[in-house]
């Protein structure tokens, strides 16, 4: 954690997510997504030892991210900046922190899924070097049905 937060001159800070963060995480998750993760999913990720981070500003949780790492690959499972602070660089900061963690675990590539309708996230991922490598049909729940997922990847080596 110290390597991620030590060089930060701003009033925001990154730290590992804890179970006692889940009330605040869920509050942001519910505001950010029409089909949010459940508290149980976050709890299970933490208990499984997945790297998970929160971003705080002046003591208030404004973002979080969850990563899984196995067999030389990392998978970004959830990355979210609170709606009121989106487009301020917080998502990029969280993404870069996850990429640093993945590199530290010697992951060779990082994968993620994103809704095709999420233009801001797609632009962020492209800006950090991710490329679209596929599509998962009907992956996400959506109002009135299902939405595909774009599968994106970044080679770290």
What are the language-model segments listed below?
Residues 2-9, 13-88, 92-105, 138, ...:
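Acetyl-CoA-dependent GNAT
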Residues 81, 115-116:
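Short amphipathic helical patch at the helix-1/turn junction of helix-turn-helix
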Residues 85-86, 90, 118, 124-128, ...:
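ABC family nucleotide-binding domain
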Residues 95, 118-121, 138-143:
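Short glycine/proline-centered loop/turn elements that form peptide/ligand docking sites
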Residues 111-113, 126, 131-151:
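Conserved catalytic-core motifs of GNAT/GCN5-like acyltransferases
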């Amino acid at each position: 954690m110290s390597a991620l937060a030590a060089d930060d001159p701003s009033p925001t800070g990154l730290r590992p997510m804890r179970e006692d963060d889940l009330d605040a995480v869920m509050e942001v998750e519910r505001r950010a997504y029409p089909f949010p993760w459940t508290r149980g999913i976050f709890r299970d990720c933490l208990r499984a030892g997945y790297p998970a981070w929160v971003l705080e500003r002046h003591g208030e949780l404004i973002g979080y991210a969850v990563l899984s790492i196995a067999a030389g690959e990392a998978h970004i499972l959830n990355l979210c900046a609170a709606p009121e602070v989106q487009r301020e660089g917080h998502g990029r900061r969280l993404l870069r922190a996850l990429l640093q963690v993945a590199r530290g675990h010697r992951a060779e590539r990082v994968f993620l899924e994103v809704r095709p309708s999420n233009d801001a996230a797609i632009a962020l991922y492209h800006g950090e070097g991710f490329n679209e490598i596929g599509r998962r049909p009907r992956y996400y729940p959506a109002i009135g049905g299902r939405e595909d997922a774009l599968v994106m990847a970044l080679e770290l080596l």
